[in-house]
Structures are given as structure tokens and as C-alpha cells.
């Protein structure tokens, strides 16, 4: 999905697990002025403030904050599909600082831009500065934001390089023999799950780490090992 994302500078299979594939980068980033390395940036209008996942690895709820709400408003990190500030897509939930805009409350069409991810980094040091995510519609059941579904642009503003990526919502395909069926990013405090395709009938996608055909260790502001699985 998250070349994660989340939230990486690249965790493996994608940007922010394709727009949410930079989990470790959203947990600790440099703020807009660079004065506090533990801060996360202030939310932009209509951006989601956190990404929640009910984790099939250990049944825990993992939370990836992306920005800080303003005006004394807090970003809820509790799973609640009925609070008016959440969009739920299967085991994922996007949280907003205020009520979800009405323009989002419809199912994505095949041609529609479903999600926009904006990544800011220092153009010299490549240090990740901020991630802003914007939903444009609701991705229906059995669909997701696959890694190959995006296009994007790059611009430079002052000392920052800004990458804008646009994702489409697509129905998950049946895995081929050499496809990654899902990836498990295991960190010191968080575990992120990304499903890439559905295994053929009679096969399953394993969760045992020893079954991974590929592992990748990544250390930036946090430490993650990504385990890529194939259908068995």
C-alpha cells in the first residue's frame, strides 16, 4: 500500500504503508520551527490527525498520530465509529480534529482520488519533517490503497522538499505465487499490518514471523523490522 509510507523513511512495502507507511516518522518528527524534536506538526484544515489499526497480529489497537489539533481540541486515539470524527475502513480508522467533512462521506468510485498524502522533508539532510493525510471518500470493504495506485508531484519550498501523492482505492486482487500477501512491521511498541492481496482458495497468509520470505530492519526515529509474507 500505508514505496508507509505509515509514516518510514521507507519501511518496506510502501509510503505510509502507501500513505500510511511511515509509522515511525509520525511518532517523532521535527516541528515546523525545528525547536522540539518530539513535536508533531499542527494539523491542516480537513487533514486526519491520527490513524488507528485493530491489529490482527496481537489483537491490540495501534495508534499513529500524524498531527496536533489546534484551538484546544484534542485528537481522539480511541476506537469509536460513532463519534462523528472518524472514518472506519475495516480494521483501520482515521481520526479527525472535528466532525468529518460531508464531502468525504461517500464510497470511492474507481476513478476517484481517494487519499492524498503530503510528505515534507529537509531538502539537504532528507530528514522527515511532516506528513499530512487527506481522505476524499470511503474505501469500501475488501478494497485498499495499493502501492501501485498512486501518482504524485515534487516541489521545493525554501529548505523543504514537498512530495504530494494521490492514491486510488482498489479492490484487493488475488495473490500470485511471488506476491507479498501481507507485511508485518514490528516495532518496539507498535505493530503495523498491511494486507496487499488475497490468497487463493486453499492457501493462507501466515502471521508467524519465521515464515517471512524477506525481512528488513529500519531505524530512523523508531526501530521497525518488516516481515514480508507469501501465501502458503
From Swiss-Prot:
Q: Does the keyword RNA-binding apply?
A: no
Q: Does the keyword Secreted apply?
A: yes
Q: Which Gene3D superfamilies match?
A: 2.20.20.160
Alphabetically sorted, this entry's keywords are:
Disulfide bond, Secreted, Signal, Toxin
State the compartments where it is located: Secreted
Propeptide feature ranges: 22-32
Leader sequence segment? 1-21
For molecular function, the Gene Ontology terms on record are: toxin activity
Q: Found in which tissues?
A: Expressed by the venom gland.
- What is known about its processing and modification? Contains 8 disulfide bonds.
- Give GO cellular component annotations, separated by semicolons: extracellular region
Family, per entry: Belongs to the scoloptoxin-11 family.
UniProt-recorded name of the protein: U-scoloptoxin(11)-Ssd2a
Organism (species): Scolopendra dehaani (Thai centipede)
Amino acid at each position: 500500500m500505508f514505496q508507509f509510507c505509515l509514516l518510514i523513511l521507507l519501511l518496506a512495502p510502501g509510503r505510509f504503508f502507501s500513505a500510511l507507511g511511515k509509522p515511525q516518522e509520525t511518532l517523532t518528527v521535527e516541528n515546523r520551527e525545528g525547536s522540539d524534536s518530539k513535536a508533531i506538526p499542527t494539523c491542516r484544515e480537513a487533514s486526519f490527525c491520527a490513524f488507528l489499526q485493530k491489529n490482527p497480529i496481537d489483537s491490540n489497537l495501534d495508534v499513529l498520530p500524524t498531527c496536533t489539533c489546534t484551538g484546544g481540541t484534542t485528537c481522539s486515539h480511541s476506537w469509536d465509529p460513532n463519534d462523528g470524527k472518524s472514518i472506519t475502513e475495516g480494521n483501520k480508522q482515521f481520526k479527525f480534529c472535528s466532525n468529518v467533512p460531508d464531502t468525504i462521506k461517500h464510497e470511492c468510485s474507481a476513478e476517484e482520488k481517494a487519499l492524498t498524502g503530503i510528505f515534507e522533508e529537509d531538502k539537504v539532510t532528507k530528514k522527515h519533517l511532516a506528513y499530512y493525510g487527506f481522505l476524499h471518500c470511503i474505501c469500501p470493504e475488501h478494497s485498499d490503497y495499493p502501492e501501485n495506485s498512486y501518482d504524485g508531484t515534487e516541489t521545493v519550498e525554501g529548505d523543504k522538499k514537498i512530495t504530494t501523492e494521490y492514491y486510488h482505492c482498489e479492490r484487493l486482487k488475488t495473490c500470485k505465487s511471488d506476491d507479498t500477501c501481507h507485511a508485518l512491521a514490528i516495532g518496539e511498541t507498535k505493530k503495523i499490518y498491511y494486507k496487499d492481496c488475497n490468497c487463493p482458495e486453499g492457501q493462507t497468509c501466515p502471521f508467524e514471523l519465521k515464515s517471512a520470505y524477506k525481512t528488513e530492519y529500519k531505524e530512523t526515529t523508531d526501530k521497525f523490522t518488516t516481515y514480508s509474507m507469501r501465501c502458503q
